[in-house]
Amino acid sequence: MQKNVPDPTAPTLIHLDEARSGVPRSVPPMRPRLASGPFNSHEHLFEVKWDGVRAFLGRDRDGLRLVDRAGGDLLPAIPELRDAKIPEGVLLDGEVIVCDSRGRPSYDLLAARLGPKAAKRGRGPIFVAFDLLYEGHRPLLRRPLEERRQRLAALGLADRKVAVPDHLEDDGEPFFDAVEEYGLEGIVAKKRRSPYVPAGRTSDWLKLHVTPRADVIIGGVEIDNERGARRLLCGWTAPGGLAYAGEAYVPPFLARWVDEATRGFASDRSPFIAPVGVRPGLRWMRPLLIAIVAHAGAPGPELEDARFRSLRLDGDAASAVHEEPVEVETVPPVGPAERPRLVVLHSLPFG
C-alpha cells in the first residue's frame, strides 16, 4: 500500500521556515477569526481592517512581485505599484487599497479598477503593509508579531506606493469607536506573541466589522426581467457541500450588473445539499462566485437582512464559511482618550 507523500511544492510552515535562501512568491495567508465584540487586552495589538484585496509584495534577485493570496500576478492590473521601493529579500503581507475622496479605503473603487473596464477612479492604488514575513532572504514566520512589526517599521518604507499603518496597544474598544467614527471597515486584534501561521485561521488574530459582513457563495439568483437581479441565494462551505445561508437583497443600481456578471455561471440544478424552495425567475448557479454581503449580525447559520455589496475579487470557497464568534474578556482602557483617533488618522495613507 502506497503511503501518502506530501507534495514538495506545497508551502508549509516547516518548509517556509526552514528555507535559508530565496523569497517565496507568496505564503498562504494567515486569517483572523470573528470576534463577538470589541474588547481591550494587554495581550493584543489593534489595527485598522482594510477594505481591499489581500496581497503579498516582495522583491528577490529577479525583481518586484505583487501577487494575490492565490499567487496570481497583480502587477499587470496594478502597474502603478511596479516602482514600489522595497529592499531585496523582503516579503510583505498586506492589502492593495484604493481610497475615496475623503481618504477612506473603498472596495467598490478597487473592484472597478480591477474589473474588465478598469475604471481608474479614486486615490491610489497603494499597498498597505501590515506584516513582514521575510527580511534579508530569511523567514520571520516563527518570530512574534511584535518583533515582525518593529522590523517592518524599521524598514522605513512609507511613501506614495507603500504605507505602513500604525497600531494601538491595549485599548480595542475606543479604537473600534474611532474606526466607526471615520467610516472604516473595522479592526483586527492580533496577539503580540503570535507567530505567522500560513493558511491558518486561529484566534490569535480576531476581526470585527463595524457593519457585519460575510463572504458567501452564490448558489442562485432571482431574476426580474425588467429590473435584473433581485436577490441572491447564498451558501456557506460546509461538510458535504454547500449549506444554504439565506437570501441577500440586490440594490436596484446593481441589479443589471449582477444579472450580467452571473449569467456565465448558470446551472440546471441546485448546488445546495438540502432542498431550497423554487420561485419564479430563479437561476441556479455553479458554486464558484463569492459575494460580499452586509447583514444584521444576528447569530445563527442563516443571514438576516442581508444586502449584496460586491463580488469578491480574490474569493475562494474556503473563506465562505459560517463563523462562530469568539468571546474575549475585556479589561479597562489604559491609554489617553485621544490616542485611538490619532492612530486611525496616522494609519490612513491619505489622512
Regions found by a protein language model. Give the residues of each.
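Catalytic cores of nucleic-acid ligases and guanylyltransferases
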Residues: 1-351
